[in-house]
Amino acid sequence: MSRTPIIAGNWKLNMNPKETVEFVNAVKDQLPDPSKVESVICAPAVDLDALLKAAEGSNLHVGAENCYWENSGAFTGETSPAVLKEMGVQYVIIGHSERRDYFHETDEDINKKAKAIFANGLTPILCCGESLETREAGKENEWVVSQIKAGLEGLTSEQVSKLVIAYEPIWAIGTGKTASSDQAEEMCKTIRETVKDLYNEETAENVRIQYGGSVKPANVKELMAKPNIDGGLVGGASLVPDSYLALVNYQD
């Protein structure tokens, strides 16, 4: 099974619609063929309309950074997965450490979101990762495996085959510290083995696993050379057209 590499930018709370259009115009003609590398930008909800319109007809795929687990109702301030699908969004990030930390999202919340995202024909990018304290205590595998088990609860093997899992060690996000490519590979391998234990070998071979945490043009090739790393979830380096292009075109 050859898994298509996926490089996804996570803009977090950055960029406005005007900057979004300028970014897309700067990158859209230089993106790789999606059969070689899938290029994704996950943007704030307020930028998605501009991003989708600007990216139309290009090789850029669009993701949201969050959504709710209900499609409609009295949920002030939330984003509907059904409307994201109608708009043309393909991916939704869930379980990012910033959501878990600042907005107190639990594994149960994240699992409900995963189910709602799949029910609407979208693909979740499920984030997992440990803190520095957990790693220093030697409990990183236990921690990440429990996040994966809880996040995938009740999902079918067919759904999980289409899933993207992003391993983001919290201590490496926006700190300039990167897990070594060996550390990243080791955890991505553990994640794949967990999927195999929960489902079967075929599902584990199909699931795409990204590394996130200070991914930049200088380290992307080394990370992507690892057998269990299928992509990157990229923060700061995805805000600048030149560095984003260097990341998605890492094979050149």
Curated annotation (Swiss-Prot):
Positions annotated to bind substrate: 10-12, 174, 214, 235-236
Family: Belongs to the triosephosphate isomerase family.
InterPro entries: Aldolase_TIM, TIM_sf, TrioseP_Isoase_bac/euk, Triosephosphate_isomerase, Triosephosphate_isomerase_AS
Subunit annotation: Homodimer.
Pfam family, one: TIM
Keywords: Cytoplasm, Gluconeogenesis, Glycolysis, Isomerase
UniProt catalytic activity: D-glyceraldehyde 3-phosphate = dihydroxyacetone phosphate
Enzyme class: isomerase
Organism from which the protein derives: Lactobacillus delbrueckii subsp. bulgaricus (strain ATCC 11842 / DSM 20081 / BCRC 10696 / JCM 1002 / NBRC 13953 / NCIMB 11778 / NCTC 12712 / WDCM 00102 / Lb 14)
Major location (coarse): cytoplasm
Active site location: 96 (electrophile), 168 (proton acceptor)
Localization of this protein: Cytoplasm
Listed NCBIfam families: tim
GO biological process, one term: gluconeogenesis
Gene responsible for this protein: tpiA
EC number: 5.3.1.1
Recorded metabolic or biological pathway in which this protein acts: Carbohydrate biosynthesis; gluconeogenesis; Carbohydrate degradation; glycolysis; D-glyceraldehyde 3-phosphate from glycerone phosphate: step 1/1
Top-rank lineage group of the source organism: Bacteria
Name the record gives this protein: Triosephosphate isomerase
GO molecular function ontology, one term from the record: triose-phosphate isomerase activity
